[in-house]
């Protein structure tokens, strides 16, 4: 959020990462997408910032630059690269996902997380629906605590909830990091040159 970025600036950070609602992981509780959040950050901040959340191609890099960011953070996108130290099942899940395949969990706990839909996420959402705001972290502990090694290292895709951004809908391949960066920069340069 802008207020978190301003706090980072106030305590002396040299730069900030501004995360839109599209991001994988914890987007905060304000639900502000990058098309609003980035220009607001540009209005308020004196320090440079990078755009995070929903970033994965040259179009998005150009858009982020136009809205005042100095660059982009592509968390979910870099998971689907050859060098990413995760199981091939995780990479393939991202390639096969659409922008509609994420869910928000832990809202009643005010610790909202965007994750890829799977069996564990369905269980969490059912518990949230039945327990409402009486839910406690202990109620979903089995689906969220300590699950990353099973998913990321062993490829057990339904072992628990795992962070994934909406940008999954734009992930169509598993390039090397070098190929991905060169592609994003090339796309961005082409867009800027042709406008």
Task: Explain the meaning of each model-derived region.
Residues 1, 21-22, 77:
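Short, ordered loop/turn segments at secondary-structure junctions
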Residues 3-11:
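Conserved alpha/beta-domain cores
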Residues 10, 28-50, 56-195:
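Conserved active-site-proximal phosphate/metal-binding subdomains
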Residues 14-20:
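Non-cysteine beta-strand/loop elements that form the S-adenosyl-L-methionine
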Residues 20-23, 46-47:
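Glycine/charged-rich beta-loop-alpha catalytic/anionic-binding loops adjacent to active sites
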């Amino acid at each position: 959020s802008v207020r978190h970025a301003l706090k980072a600036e106030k305590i002396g950070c040299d730069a900030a990462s501004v995360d839109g609602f599209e991001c994988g992981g914890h987007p905060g509780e304000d639900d502000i997408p990058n098309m609003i959040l980035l220009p607001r950050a540009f209005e308020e901040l004196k320090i440079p910032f990078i755009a995070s959340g929903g970033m994965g191609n040259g179009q998005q890099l150009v858009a982020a630059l136009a809205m005042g960011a100095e660059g982009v953070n592509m968390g979910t996108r870099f998971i689907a690269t050859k060098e990413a130290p995760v199981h091939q099942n995780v990479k393939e899940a991202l390639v096969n996902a659409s922008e509609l395949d994420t869910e928000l969990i832990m809202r009643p706990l005010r610790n909202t997380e965007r994750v890829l839909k799977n069996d564990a996420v369905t269980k969490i959402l059912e518990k949230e629906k039945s327990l409402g705001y009486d839910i406690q972290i202990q109620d979903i502990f089995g689906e969220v605590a300590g699950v990353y090694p099973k998913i990321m290292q062993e490829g057990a895709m339904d072992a628990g909830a795992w962070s994934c951004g909406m940008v999954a809908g734009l992930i169509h391949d598993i390039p090397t990091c070098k190929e991905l960066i060169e592609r994003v920069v090339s796309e961005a340069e082409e867009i800027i040159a042709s406008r």
